[in-house]
């Protein structure tokens, strides 16, 4: 089978199903994540809460960070590129990143166009807060989706909103008559063939993970309960009081999300989680989820 085909890239993303993908800033953190059972790591210079606090322009991480992390772990390594920044994505592909996240956490390089992801061998991850965004990203070649949530806040409310909305929109598309799908595709700004796929299959054609605000084992389990295929944890782990224990607890809660006694057990004595931010306190310009279209 030819490498870089849509089928191969989606298959690679499918392999992450049920897993936890953790943000790491150095080789040491990457080793902690792998030992805790992470299915992959996201190598970056600053976690979303630090990016939010620092302000200014957030760009692709120094390639050294990615190289250091790739040397010490055997699990896949992801890295973030700015929305629309073709060259950052090409650089990450050249460095050997296993997946690229075209991420709203970084400052967008292009406010009109996303990257043409079909043109790359490496699979892409993209954020989506509704079904229209999800299908537009898939049409551009995304092999994996995640809720946008509101990164770096430690507040799960937006990730819950996005996951519930996407699930309800899937159910709506399924309920429509076939001849109504053209108008629905137009309303969503999405390709008809992808709307038809959802109508016939009752699901997205790629995996959809939860991200943006996952801060506790219960948060991770909640997102799985709502239909997520897995979980991204950004600031939540290494901003907590005991990262090793916290990372293991998140993995356990994600894997056994219906075992509430186990979740209670792994949640004990974890120390304080990261300090959260109330979404209503954010200015419109601080809302990362509204980047991209």
From Swiss-Prot:
Q: What is this protein called?
A: Pyridoxal 5'-phosphate synthase subunit PdxS
Entry-linked HAMAP family: PdxS
Q: Which residues form the active site?
A: 80
Spell out the molecular function terms from Gene Ontology. Answer: pyridoxal 5'-phosphate synthase (glutamine hydrolysing) activity
Catalytic activity field: aldehydo-D-ribose 5-phosphate + D-glyceraldehyde 3-phosphate + L-glutamine = pyridoxal 5'-phosphate + L-glutamate + phosphate + 3 H2O + H(+)
What EC designation does it have?
Answer: 4.3.3.6
The Swiss-Prot or TrEMBL record describes its family as follows: Belongs to the PdxS/SNZ family.
Q: Supply the PANTHER family for this chain.
A: PYRIDOXAL 5'-PHOSPHATE SYNTHASE SUBUNIT SNZ1-RELATED
TM region positions: none
Pathway in which the depicted protein is active = Cofactor biosynthesis; pyridoxal 5'-phosphate biosynthesis
Q: Which UniProt keywords apply?
A: Lyase, Pyridoxal phosphate, Schiff base
Describe the subunit structure: In the presence of PdxT, forms a dodecamer of heterodimers.
Q: Which organism is it from?
A: Niallia circulans (Bacillus circulans)
The record's Pfam families line, in alphabetical order, gives: SOR_SNZ
Q: Which domain of life is it from?
A: Bacteria
User: What is this protein for, i.e. what is its function?
Assistant: Catalyzes the formation of pyridoxal 5'-phosphate from ribose 5-phosphate (RBP), glyceraldehyde 3-phosphate (G3P) and ammonia. The ammonia is provided by the PdxT subunit. Can also use ribulose 5-phosphate and dihydroxyacetone phosphate as substrates, resulting from enzyme-catalyzed isomerization of RBP and G3P, respectively.
Q: Which residues bind D-glyceraldehyde 3-phosphate?
A: 164
Q: Which InterPro entries match?
A: Aldolase_TIM (IPR013785), PdxS/SNZ (IPR001852), PdxS/SNZ_N (IPR033755), RibuloseP-bd_barrel (IPR011060)
Q: Which GO terms describe its biological process?
A: amino acid metabolic process; pyridoxal phosphate biosynthetic process; pyridoxine biosynthetic process
Which of the seven top EC classes does this enzyme belong to? lyase
């Amino acid at each position: 089978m030819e490498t870089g085909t849509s089928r191969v890239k989606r298959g690679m993303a499918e392999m992450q199903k049920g897993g936890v993908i953790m943000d790491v800033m150095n080789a040491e953190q990457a080793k902690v994540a792998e030992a805790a059972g992470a299915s992959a790591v996201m190598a970056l210079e600053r976690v979303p809460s630090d990016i939010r606090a620092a302000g200014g322009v957030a760009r692709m991480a120094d390639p050294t960070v990615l190289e250091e992390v790739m040397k010490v772990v055997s699990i896949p390594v992801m890295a973030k590129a700015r929305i629309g920044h073709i060259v950052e994505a090409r650089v990450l592909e050249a460095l050997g990143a296993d997946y690229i996240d075209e991420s709203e956490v970084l400052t967008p390089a292009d406010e009109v166009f996303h990257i043409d992801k079909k043109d790359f061998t490496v699979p892409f991850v993209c954020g989506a807060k509704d079904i229209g965004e999800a299908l537009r990203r898939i049409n551009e070649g995304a092999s994996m989706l995640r809720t946008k949530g509101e990164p770096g806040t430690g507040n799960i409310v937006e990730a819950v909103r996005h996951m519930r909305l996407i699930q309800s929109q899937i159910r709506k598309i399924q309920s429509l008559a076939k001849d109504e799908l053209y108008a629905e595709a137009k309303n969503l700004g999405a390709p008809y063939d992808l709307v038809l796929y959802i109508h016939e299959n009752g699901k997205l054609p790629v995996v959809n993970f939860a991200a943006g605000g996952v801060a506790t084992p219960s948060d991770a389990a909640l997102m799985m309960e709502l239909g997520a295929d897995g979980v991204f944890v950004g600031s939540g782990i290494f901003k907590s009081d005991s990262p090793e224990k916290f990372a293991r607890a998140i993995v356990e809660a994600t894997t056994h999300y219906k075992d509430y006694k186990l979740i209670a057990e792994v949640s004990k004595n974890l120390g304080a989680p990261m300090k959260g931010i109330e979404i209503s306190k954010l200015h419109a310009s601080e809302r990362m989820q509204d980047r991209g279209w």
